[in-house]
């Protein structure tokens, strides 16, 4: 028994040593960035080096190629230890690459890599993607900061949920187009989500600014905690949406008409006027309903003009139509009429007298 116990202890000790040696002898790639430069794609790997004073040095290695597999091979030649992708948290695509070259081939390579998780965050950058990695954000490394930034804004702010898996589902699902958050570098220590980029056949065809993300999220996500300013004459109110849901209805086939019902329960956080009453709250609710209806309908018309369908009207109508013809839908989509009806309820307020 003592001999068996000694073997178990020795085996456990050896396993612990082996794992430590493996971790110590590799470079863990936590972020990737891709740009279109000089007719080739430049790939950049972000490697965190943890220093003795508990700070993180963000090291980057870059290589240019036309094949995604060549990036890793060429970057390996620059790295002192083997480079592994199993810890990849975020991938950034430069603006020019996303518009001119497209990103499908790159995304496909990530999807085929069994070491990369499906929950990998993707984003488009304003300007070069590599320059975003050149900053210093937070104390845990740039990749962790950027992935947390995206996750936080999806969970409790205005960015609709998306990742590697959702992007590929939307792309492969006929009648729905993918979208990604857009990241802007402000300075060496700060970045922000500046909007959303929308795709058609793997290329960015449109971008909306951050102040329109609230309305888009209402169209595609069943939960939103975004904040919004509502102007009532000379006064203003700060609204926080704590819960929302939407439902699509096909109300007519000839002509094609889809109605979107959006329900929002909100909290009134702040009011610029002297006194807030129930009557004024009703006016705020009505104003917000009007804003949602107008802005959401503007977005759907915008998407139609760009021939992108991030709301998924094509997929929805297909589910309601026997023998649906997607070739015909390509023509019919531009003539689709969308009516948005909003129902807003302010459930509580800390500023009512």
What feature does the model see in each segment?
Residues 2-353:
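Membrane-proximal alpha-helical signals and transmembrane carboxylates
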